[in-house]
């Protein structure tokens, strides 16, 4: 039962407060809410031991329980003033805790785990990365339990929960206007880029930020704004494509949407209770991975720049995420790359991004003028033990240093926080190393500098005043019908029509469609394990049935829909090749047929690892098979079965694809980027018209893929189809033909 209290506070005239001093306290489930006429709403747990302070007609939380109003407790002060005061009060142990960012934490229930209680209490950790949550109500209750727990510790610093992107689409889920879901569903970042409309990305940010805050999330580990200049790269789908100008505009819109609170919710300028800190990543040059291999693994630790084009990779940051329009000025945090920028440091330091003074201090802090939080990517200080996914850590270039020495080097480069580190011990050791080298005063100043940056981001979003959530309200906000409708509309606008021979689409009226099953092969997971092999529909018959009659007999059908996925790529490394006497390095293929790397480099640009006795990582002459080759076979067989009747190919992608094996057999091709299949059907049936454009080039063949430069965009020979259309960046079609609008004019070179 809710209880309400009225407490009379003497009237004292004071700038920023005043009024009659009356406040209302509402008792909730495990926490209280304080409403005051001339100040922000306060939330606190009656079990945490903190009290309320009354000063000049205003109410404050006595977070350190010392009976007086400290500057950091005074919401009338700026975040900068408050962060400076609190950072000066904290012990080195407490600051070391702020420098930690937890390992991935799932939230299956509302109670804290023993591990969570331990790192919150003993290690003073306050930045928690959550992954899966049961539902919005459970997430809100977990948040409240976590906030009540830390509120009673030390200086009462609230938890700052974060998340990787969590608004992807479930392809089989049906969209019903007026119906809600677990969370609003949007196309992938690459799909957002395919709209070529930053306003859609801004709208996504404003909606996702509300959902994040309702889940207790105040920091987004996004956007990923690397320009994907290497077409084989595993993480291509998480980017806004290969173009630096488009990526910059999308990055700006994304950060503005997430960080800007509407005036009603603003606390400090545009910062407020609907703001979510954007941690833009990855500074910088990550999209140039040699051979497409990824630096999560030792075999992909190098990014290379044969086109001498490293500095273009800064543009989405310096011209986008660091130049916002919404009032928060800049993305509040940055995550550097894992990769070694091969031979790019003028002083010769081939080390991972967070270990590089060139990358952080010189390029980010000095050249770009960024003074916000810098947080390492996850597990860079851990040891690495193998060349494949089992290795563990990512200490690229500093494998010979101890864990504590790695922490010290990272701090020396200007980094503030360690992703995936729950243990304050190595940070304390690094402090001791700094004291030994530079003295206690310098070490204390360096730690306070990071504490100041980290705390500003917590003050700006109002967590010190009220970190608590109403679980029922959270359930109402997350995935509400309006948010779902906006996400679905973005999905419709993200699907590219590549081919429409003889105006095959749209197909209107009562027709019969042949819908063949797809082979889902058993494939190795990125982190190990094998998927199950089976046959099923990529687009379910029940999704198609509202639009057409479905048949399994091609002879009866008026047309066919063949839904497939892009070629399943290898990671560019194989233990089987090592066992067979090779160096382990294999091609990454973008085609369905077996691929032999005839045109690969004789000598790799980069190389060397403590676990290898050689430098050259070339895979020239080696052959790889594509696990889902049957997708190509399915298209070709369907063409044969259908004779001259239309065959529509629906291709889900997350990176460029060689289409020479598919396009000649299709009358129409739709390219999707992780959308609901219902959206595909609404386009095929003509309920909506396609409007998206390709955010990347589609290569003619694998030779042009091998011969392009990893660091340069728009440098491949593109595929030209049977109708004479070339699948270049910004190509797309609507019912009238090839699109030539202001978006194409703005972004094509």
Predicted regions and their residues:
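Generic cytosolic/nucleocytoplasmic N-terminal low-complexity/intrinsically disordered segments
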Residues: 1-2, 19
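A periodicity- and composition-biased signal for non-globular, repetitive helical segments
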Residues: 8-9, 287
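Sec-dependent signal peptide recognition
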Residues: 2-8
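Glycoside hydrolase catalytic-domain context in secreted enzymes
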Residues: 16-749
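Hydrophobic h-region of N-terminal signal peptides that target proteins for export
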Residues: 10-16
